[in-house]
A protein has these predicted regions:
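PRPP-associated nucleotide enzymes
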Residues: 1-133
């Protein structure tokens, strides 16, 4: 079993701003920020606020995923809720930043991107990046 690291609110906020700064300094300027509910929500908020401070306009949305059924039990398929707004508004030239609190197996992110590709077709943005602190 791995040890868990628990962050207080100040550390999470500071780490979130550092993450946003790394994305900004990489030259990537998202037009959409997708934060994953629940853990990614406060991080996504800080990232969006950072870009607003830099006068970079971004649209932002929370997307919920689920595949856990009780402690240590996972279903095979990731359920994704809240992509409809993105399907209606994204264009191929958009730049999407997916923000979450942890990157474990990559299953959730892969499922989201595959679902976006399936639903958006030719409107699927060519530039999709993932950011976690």
């Amino acid at each position: 079993m791995t040890d868990k690291l628990y962050l207080d609110a100040d550390r999470l906020l500071n780490d979130s701003f550092r993450l946003a700064d790394q994305v900004y300094r990489s030259g990537f300027e998202p037009t959409f920020i997708m934060a994953l509910w629940r853990g990614g929500a406060p991080i996504g908020l800080a990232v969006q606020e950072y870009f607003a401070y830099r006068e970079i306009e971004t649209d932002h949305i929370l997307v919920r995923t689920s595949y856990y059924h009780g402690i240590d039990n996972q279903s095979r398929e990731v359920q994704i809720y809240g992509l409809n707004y993105l399907v209606k508004n994204l264009q191929a030239e958009d730049r999407v930043l997916i923000v979450d609190d942890v990157y474990d197996t990559g299953r959730t992110i892969i499922s989201i991107i595959e679902s976006m590709q399936d639903r958006l077709k030719l409107n699927m943005p060519q530039q999709v990046r993932v950011a976690v602190p």
